[in-house]
C-alpha cells in the first residue's frame, strides 16, 4: 500500500502526488484557500477568507500605523513609516541607493554586487524579478507539456509504422526473386537515363527511406514549438505590461485616496478650530452682556431713591 501524507490544512491523508509542492495542501484546500497577492506589499500569501486581501504583517501594520502610502522608490503601497517601504529601506541600508530597473525603468533596483543575483544579467527590481520568474516557470511547464505530447505522438506513430511494416513483411516475403531482379534493372535504367541527361543524382534519394516521414514530422513539430514559444513570449510581454499598468493605476488610486483623506482630515480640523473660536467668542459676548446688564440695574435703583 502506498504511503499517505497529511494535508497541512485539513489534516486528511492523501498520496504525495495529490499535495501541492510548497504548502502541502490537498486539492479542496487549494481551492478554498488560494495563493493571492497582498494588496499593499504585493507578496503572495494563503488566503484564509475571500474578504481577506492583505497579509498578516500588513494587517498588523495597518492597526499600528494606519493606511500606508506609496513608496517613493518602488511605488508599492507599503510605506507605513515615512515615504519608503520596509523592503526598500532595508535594501538601501544594505546595498546603497537604488538604480533604474531595466524592465520597468523605475528607480527601485538595488545592485547587490553579485552577477548571480541578476536575472539573465539584467538588474531588475523586486516586482519585475518575481514577474520574470513566474513567466519563466510557466514557459518551462508549457514547453515540458509540449515536448511530452510530441514525444507521445511520435511513439504512437512509430508503433503504427512498426505494425504496418510487420503486416506487410509476410506479403513481401512471397515476392519472387525474378520480380526483384526485374525491378533492379528498371531502377538502373532510370539512373542511367538521369545521368545521361546531365542531372545531378544521389542514389540515396531514389531508395525508399522508412525514417523520412519521422524526420519530417519532427521538423514540423520543432517549427510548431518555436512558433508557440514566440507567441508565448509575446503574450508574456503583454501580461507584464498590463500588470505594470494595473500596479501603476492602483498606486495612483491609493495615492489619490490618501490625498483626499488627508484633505478631508485637514478640513475637519480647520472646521473644528473655527467652531471652537466662534464658541469662545460667543462665551465672551455672553459674559460682556451679563456684565452690562448687572451695571445697569444699580443705576436704575439709584435714580428711584434720589427724591
UniProtKB/Swiss-Prot annotation:
Alphabetical keyword list: Coiled coil
UniProt GO cellular component terms: nuclear speck; nucleoplasm
Bilayer-spanning residue ranges: none
InterPro entries: FAM76
Region (Disordered): 161-181, 287-307
Pfam family, one: FAM76
Coiled coil: 217-297
Similarity comment: Belongs to the FAM76 family.
This protein's name: Protein FAM76A
Species assigned in the record: Gallus gallus (Chicken)
Amino acid at each position: 500500500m502506498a504511503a499517505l501524507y497529511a494535508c497541512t490544512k485539513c489534516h486528511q491523508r492523501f498520496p504525495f502526488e495529490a499535495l501541492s509542492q510548497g504548502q502541502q495542501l490537498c486539492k479542496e484546500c487549494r481551492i478554498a484557500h488560494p495563493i493571492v497577492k497582498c494588496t499593499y506589499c504585493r507578496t503572495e500569501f494563503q488566503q484564509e477568507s475571500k474578504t481577506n486581501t492583505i497579509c498578516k504583517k500588513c494587517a498588523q501594520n495597518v492597526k499600528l500605523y494606519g493606511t500606508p502610502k506609496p513608496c517613493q522608490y518602488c511605488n508599492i503601497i507599503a510605506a507605513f513609516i515615512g515615504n519608503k517601504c520596509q523592503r526598500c529601506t532595508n535594501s538601501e541600508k544594505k546595498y546603497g541607493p537604488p538604480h533604474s530597473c531595466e524592465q520597468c525603468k523605475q528607480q527601485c533596483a538595488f545592485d547587490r554586487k553579485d552577477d548571480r543575483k541578476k536575472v539573465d544579467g539584467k538588474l531588475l527590481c523586486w516586482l519585475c524579478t518575481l514577474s520574470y520568474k513566474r513567466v519563466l516557470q510557466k514557459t518551462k511547464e508549457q514547453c515540458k507539456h509540449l515536448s511530452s505530447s510530441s514525444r507521445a505522438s511520435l511513439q504512437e506513430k512509430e508503433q503504427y509504422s512498426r505494425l504496418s511494416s510487420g503486416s506487410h513483411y509476410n506479403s513481401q516475403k512471397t515476392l519472387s526473386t525474378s520480380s526483384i531482379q526485374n525491378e533492379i534493372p528498371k531502377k538502373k535504367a532510370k539512373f542511367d537515363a538521369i545521368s545521361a541527361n546531365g542531372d545531378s543524382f544521389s542514389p540515396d534519394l531514389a531508395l525508399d527511406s522508412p525514417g523520412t516521414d519521422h524526420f519530417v514530422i519532427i521538423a514540423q513539430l520543432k517549427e510548431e514549438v518555436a512558433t508557440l514559444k514566440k507567441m508565448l513570449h509575446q503574450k508574456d510581454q503583454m501580461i507584464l505590461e498590463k500588470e505594470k499598468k494595473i500596479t501603476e493605476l492602483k498606486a495612483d488610486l491609493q495615492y489619490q485616496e490618501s490625498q483626499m483623506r488627508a484633505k478631508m482630515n485637514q478640513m475637519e480640523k480647520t472646521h473644528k478650530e473655527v467652531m471652537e473660536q466662534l464658541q469662545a467668542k460667543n462665551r465672551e459676548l455672553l459674559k460682556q452682556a451679563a456684565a452690562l446688564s448687572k451695571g445697569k440695574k444699580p443705576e436704575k435703583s439709584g435714580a428711584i431713591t434720589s427724591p
